[in-house]
From Swiss-Prot:
One of its GO terms (molecular function) is tRNA binding. The keyword Transport does not apply. Pfam families: Ribosomal_L1. Keywords: Repressor, Ribonucleoprotein, Ribosomal protein, RNA-binding, rRNA-binding, Translation regulation, tRNA-binding. This is Large ribosomal subunit protein uL1. SUPFAM superfamilies: Ribosomal protein L1. It comes from Arthrobacter sp. (strain FB24). Part of the 50S ribosomal subunit.
Amino acid sequence: MAKRSKAYEAAAAKIDAEKFYAPFEAVTLAKDTNPSKFDATVEVAFRLGVDPRKADQMVRGTVNLPHGTGKVARVLVFATGDKAEAAIAAGADFVGSDDLIEKIAAGWTDFDAAVATPDLMGKVGRLGKVLGPRNLMPNPKTGTVTPDVTKAVNDIKGGKIDFRVDKHSNLHFIIGKVSFDAIKLAENYAAALEEVLRLKPSASKGRYIQKATVATTFGPGISVDPNVTKVLTEV
């Protein structure tokens, strides 16, 4: 195991490893224990009581964080004609069709989200081996296969994020930056948790959210009480 820095060890010493913190308390502590000098990302990880190998236990969806993530997403749109012009006007970073498909097929994935008009999905679908593992494949269930490219781009730029449980039954979310007020981080956390709870598969038995952890990019993990769904501001 790699040796932890003195800053990390000092930060970890402020956390009670046996305690489950309320969301507001957890994000406040994450801000206070950030060992980095830069404006680090604040993330949350949920361990779910599902078996992602089974189709009826897959958890996938989107959530609009009320305060965004602090990161402006680079959005790619597969579109032509008027739809391409609309995507450009909405602020998409990359817009095209065959040219982008060829570039991605060669291994380029320097973007954070992809949107496609329905008529191009026959071609875009061939990129599954490249985009699928990176959770970048446009999907009608997440609103990224749509004729309304303007709304899709605006939603993503405004803080909408896609999520999908990984093979280890974990979900990961960026909920903001250390520079965010704690209340905004807590409200983003609550929005993510609410959507995860809403999407609980009926086939999932037993405890659904088994663990919730908040941490900054290089900071120690802070256990959050998954039973607390409201934003409580007392610490």
